[in-house]
Amino acid sequence: MGKLFGTDGIRGIAGQTLTAELAFHVGQAVAAVLTEEKGSRPLITIGKDTRISSDMLEAALMAGICSVGGDVMPLGTIPTPAVAFLTVQQQADAGIVISASHNPYAYNGIKVFNAQGYKLSDEMEGRVEDLILNHAELPAAVDGAVGRRHHGMHALHSAYIRHLLGSIDCDLTGLRVLVDCANGAASATAPDLFRALPLQADFI
C-alpha cells in the first residue's frame, strides 16, 4: 500500500486531506503516466457520486488532466461499475471514480481504473504517487496540445442502461416495484432503466 493510494484508491475528508489541489495533481500525474505509456494524448473517463464535494474534485481532476494534454470524458453522476464498463466501451485509457462508498458524507475518494476497467496496478499507482509526492514539474500543454472535454453524457448513460437491459434473462412482466435511489450514484440512471422494463415502477 502506498502513501496516497490505499486498498481502494485515495480517500480523505474533502477539503482537508483530500483537497482540490491534490485532485488537480492526481489528474496531472495520471495523464502524464498514461501519456508516457501510450506515447500520445490519453482519454480518461470520470464518474462521480452525489457527495457535495464531488463537483469540486471533478473540476480539479479535469483541470489537471487537461493541463498536461489529456482529454476528459465526464460521465456525471453514475455508479462505479458504469465507469469501468464505459471506460472499456469507449476505448478510454483510464477511468476515474469520485466516491468514498460507505464512508460518511464529509469524506470522498479517487479511484483509478485501467483501460480494461480494473483497478490500476500497484506499479502504475506507484508511478502516479511518485510524481505527486516528489512535486514533479510536468510540462504544461499549450495551444492545441491542451486537453479537451468530450460531450455526450446522455448517450453514455443510455449505453450503460442498454448494457444492463441486455443482462436481464428473466420475465419481469407484471411486477410492481418501489424504487428509492436515496440520492445515490444510481439516481441519474436507475429511473430510465426501470422505465424501460416491462414492470410498474414507482419512485420515491
Model segments located where?
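An N-terminal, well-structured beta->alpha segment
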Residues: M1-A63, S67-V68, R149-L175
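General beta-strand structural signal in soluble alpha/beta enzymes
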Residues: F5-G6, I46, V72-T77, V97-I98, ...
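Short, electropositive, low-hydrophobicity segments enriched in small/polar residues
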Residues: I10-A20, R51, T80, S99, ...
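Gly/Ser/Thr-enriched, mixed-charge loops and adjacent short helices
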Residues: I13, N108-I204
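Ferredoxin-reductase
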Residues: A31, K38-Q116
